[in-house]
């Protein structure tokens, strides 16, 4: 029996209940920036390249359905990066995320359109020290659908915080990515077990269509 099978057997009946979609979803596009998709860049992650390709269709459908779309990016203030606190000490590679650096620009295939909300953050969670939770509550949102990167970092942190803010949390498997499959799969397993539902893109799109009426 593999380690993955052993973990699933161990968790069965204790973790992994389904939460499902509520009545009003929002699509949260987390940190789809070119630093993750540019070969040779320090943050380059092939899994994110694949996620962008899949997320483009999900984003197009959400727009057609009138679903609220929120984009996040990471932005710091050079030269001292004081707004990055301890995180930029732990991960100095994040110092690329400054205004004007091409690596900090949105990936074109999933870039925000005029009128869509863009929130800049300095830490992993899209909810930490941002107006995201009040925005979603004000719009009556009860379900947060997550796409973006990286699975083991900002996706996981945002999924946990989404649940803690009272939202049904849905992570779209094909639309999130990481630099290696091991942390990607491990974190999807954890999220699906404890914090939300990990679903296929097909299932997510079907639910968005259904809820759009």
Swiss-Prot record:
What's its catalytic activity? maleamate + H2O = maleate + NH4(+)
Set out the biological process GO terms recorded for this chain's protein: nicotinate catabolic process
Protein induction: Repressed by NicR in the absence of 6-hydroxynicotinate (6HNA) inducer. In presence of 6HNA, repression is alleviated.
Give the enzyme's EC designation.
Answer: 3.5.1.107
Q: Which InterPro entries match?
A: Isochorismatase-like_dom, Isochorismatase-like_hydrls, Isochorismatase-like_sf
Q: In which pathway does it act?
A: Cofactor degradation; nicotinate degradation
User: Which Gene Ontology MF annotations are present?
Assistant: hydrolase activity, acting on carbon-nitrogen (but not peptide) bonds, in linear amides
Which keywords has UniProt assigned to this entry? Aromatic hydrocarbons catabolism, Hydrolase
Question: What positions constitute the catalytic site?
Answer: 154 (nucleophile)
**Listed Pfam families:** Isochorismatase
Which segments cross the bilayer?
none
Family of the protein in this entry: Belongs to the isochorismatase family.
What is the annotated role of this protein in its UniProt record? Maleamate amidase that transforms maleamate into maleate and ammonia in the aerobic nicotinate degradation pathway.
Protein name according to UniProt: Maleamate amidohydrolase
Which lineage ranks, top first, belong to the organism behind this chain?
A: Bacteria, Pseudomonadati, Pseudomonadota, Gammaproteobacteria, Pseudomonadales
């Amino acid at each position: 029996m593999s380690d993955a099978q052993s973990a699933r057997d161990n968790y069965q009946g204790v973790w992994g209940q389904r939460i499902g979609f509520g009545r009003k979803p929002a699509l949260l596009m987390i940190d789809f920036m070119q630093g993750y998709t540019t070969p040779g860049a320090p943050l380059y992650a092939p899994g994110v390249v694949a996620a962008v390709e899949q997320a483009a269709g999900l984003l197009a459908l959400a727009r057609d359905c009138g679903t609220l779309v929120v984009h996040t990016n990471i932005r710091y203030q050079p030269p001292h990066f004081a707004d990055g606190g301890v995180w930029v000490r732990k991960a100095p590679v994040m110092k690329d995320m400054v205004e004007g650096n091409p690596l900090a620009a949105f990936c074109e295939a999933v870039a925000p359109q005029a009128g869509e909300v863009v929130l800049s953050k300095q830490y992993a969670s899209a909810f930490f020290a941002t107006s995201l939770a009040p925005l979603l509550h004000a719009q009556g949102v009860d379900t947060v659908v997550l796409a973006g990167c990286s699975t083991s970092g900002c996706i996981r942190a945002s999924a946990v915080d989404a649940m803690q803010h009272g939202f049904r949390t849905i992570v779209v498997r094909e639309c999130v990515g990481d630099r290696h499959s091991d942390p990607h799969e491990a974190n999807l397993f954890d999220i699906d077990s404890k914090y939300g539902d990990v679903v296929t893109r097909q299932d997510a799109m079907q639910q968005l269509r259904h809820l759009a009426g």
